[in-house]
């Protein structure tokens, strides 16, 4: 039986853990608390004064600013495994962190499954590469395409909050994100390595494949060299774009067929992700195009962009991928912000449609804006009427203008306050009241209908009549429905695709 260690933490509280290493990271050893509600991670080597000051700021300054004692502060606690305390033991510095939520550990995996076992962490790497997810992850652990969109939304939202605090992660990658594709959740880990304003950043520059090209280009320079590009918010943006691309498409955006240095694999990697970085789906420069005949069977179909192009992620994400990997790959100021990713992912989640093939592994797909929509994952064409709601709003009660925002309708789909009014947020600030559905959609007696549940202003602008709470309106082609007549209120115009 391991010995119980009792320490007094920096804030005077008692920390108790067993003297038995339960997990090891790149620079830390992890011990479990006696009640298994938290872990204590000790750096293997003594850390310098700068790192101590930086970690102290993370634990005692920024934690209190982000995790405020209110609804919004509690909301963020699910998004980060944030250090809560600092301890010293045997001349080494340790950080106290909450135990990961149980949803971030595999469960329900058959004992006969040879690869992943129950109790293993759901490290993001399992779900980012086609080879890993196709060979090693059981089908019932993969989640749907919509779940993966939600997962990416949580990551983008977490990074937006981090950046708003002036912090950068410095090593954002699939290794430092725990994910649960079954519930669409994600948690940012290794928060002790954050880049804190006015403090020297940690010496780690990131994980290969996620390091921004401009950082990789100067990695050989000493850390105090003014020409060295160090991790910061702008470099996080590159890593975030790569992470979203890999989680949705299960391939790396820069891993194409071009070999930049045939003699030195390290130089080849440095060029591939650094000075010569080139998007594998670049529309005009095919230099780094994927050579499908060189892919392993387990990398297909996801590894073949001609079969599953990035455009299957929808127009909002396609635009941001272009900015990240074409316009901004060697021009960091153009790379999309975490907020832009968050907003695009919210809109994309409203563009999804359930696949009509019950055996489809993805279950959902993004509407492709054609008259014959089909699931890109299994090839099943949509059959029947497909209603699309186009959102319009009137700035200062003027003429209604398009928002370039749509909502796909499917049976039992719900309408929320953030759909009816563009001033209502869909994020950590959404009130409990605004999280309640205000309407729902059904296929009833051969037609699609919208039932009004909680919108006092709903009005059929086509037939010039109010739609009271509890009443419904048919979704006919071209019908205009006012959802909210107040400031920010939206008008929807119905479009019907018949296939």
Describe the residue ranges of each PLM region.
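ATP-binding glycine-rich phosphate-binding loop
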Residues: 2-54, 74-82, 88-90, 433
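Catalytic-loop of the protein kinase fold
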Residues: 150-152, 159-181
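Activation of the activation-loop gatekeeper triad in protein kinase-fold domains
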Residues: 189-195
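C-terminal boundary/linker segments immediately following FHA domains
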Residues: 459-499
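Terminal C-lobe "cap" of eukaryotic-type protein kinase domains
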Residues: 322-352
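Conserved activation segment of eukaryotic-like protein kinases, specifically the C-terminal portion
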Residues: 201-225
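Conserved C-lobe activation region of Hanks-type protein kinase-like domains
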Residues: 231-237, 244-318
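Conserved structural core of kinase catalytic domains
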Residues: 78-147, 200, 205
């Amino acid at each position: 039986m391991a010995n119980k260690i009792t320490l007094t933490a920096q804030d005077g509280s008692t920390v108790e853990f067993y003297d038995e290493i339960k997990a090891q990271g790149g620079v830390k050893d992890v011990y479990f608390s006696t009640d298994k509600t938290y872990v204590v991670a000790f750096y293997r080597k003594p850390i310098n004064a700068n790192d101590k000051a930086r970690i102290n700021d993370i634990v005692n300054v920024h934690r209190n600013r982000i995790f405020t004692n209110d609804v919004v502060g509690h909301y963020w606690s699910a998004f980060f495994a944030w250090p809560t305390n600092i301890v010293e033991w045997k001349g080494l510095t340790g950080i106290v962190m909450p135990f990961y939520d149980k949803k971030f550990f595999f469960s329900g995996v058959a004992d006969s499954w040879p690869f992943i076992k129950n109790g293993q962490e759901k490290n993001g790497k399992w779900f980012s590469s086609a080879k890993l997810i196709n060979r090693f992850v059981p089908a019932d652990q993969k989640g749907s395409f919509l779940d993966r969109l939600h997962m990416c939304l949580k990551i983008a939202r977490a990074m937006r909050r981090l950046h708003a605090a002036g912090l950068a992660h410095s090593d954002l990658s699939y290794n430092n994100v725990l994910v649960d594709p079954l519930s669409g959740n994600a948690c940012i880990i290794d928060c002790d390595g954050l880049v804190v304003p006015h403090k020297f950043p940690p010496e780690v520059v990131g994980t290969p494949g996620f390091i921004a090209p401009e950082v990789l280009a100067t990695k050989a320079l000493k850390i105090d060299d003014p020409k060295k590009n160090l991790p910061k918010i702008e470099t996080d943006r590159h890593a975030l774009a790569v992470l979203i691309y890999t989680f949705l498409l299960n391939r790396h955006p820069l891993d194409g067929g071009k070999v930049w240095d045939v003699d030195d694999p390290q130089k080849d990697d440095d060029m591939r992700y650094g000075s010569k970085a080139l998007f594998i789906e670049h529309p005009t420069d095919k230099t780094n195009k994927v050579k499908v005949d060189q892919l392993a069977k387990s990398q297909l179909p996801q590894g073949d962009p001609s079969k599953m192009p990035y455009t299957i992620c929808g127009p909002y994400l396609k635009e941001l991928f272009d900015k990240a990997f074409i316009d901004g790959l060697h021009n960091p100021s153009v790379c999309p912000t975490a907020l832009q990713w968050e907003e695009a992912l919210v809109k994309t989640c409203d563009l999804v449609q359930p696949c009509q093939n019950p055996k489809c592994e993805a279950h959902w797909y993004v509407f492709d804006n054609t008259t014959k929509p089909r699931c890109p994952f299994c090839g099943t064409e949509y059959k029947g009427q497909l209603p699309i709601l186009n959102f319009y709003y009137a700035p200062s009660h003027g003429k209604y203008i398009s928002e370039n925002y749509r909502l796909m309708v499917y049976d039992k789909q719900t309408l929320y306050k953030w759909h009816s009014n563009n001033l209502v947020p869909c994020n950590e600030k959404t009130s409990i009241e605004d999280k309640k559905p205000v309407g729902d959609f059904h296929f009833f007696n051969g037609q699609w209908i919208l039932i009004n549940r909680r919108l006092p202003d709903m009005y059929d602008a086509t037939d010039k009549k109010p739609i009271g709470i509890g009443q419904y309106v048919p979704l006919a082609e071209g019908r205009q429905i006012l959802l909210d007549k107040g400031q920010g209120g939206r008008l929807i115009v119905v479009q019907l695709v018949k296939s």
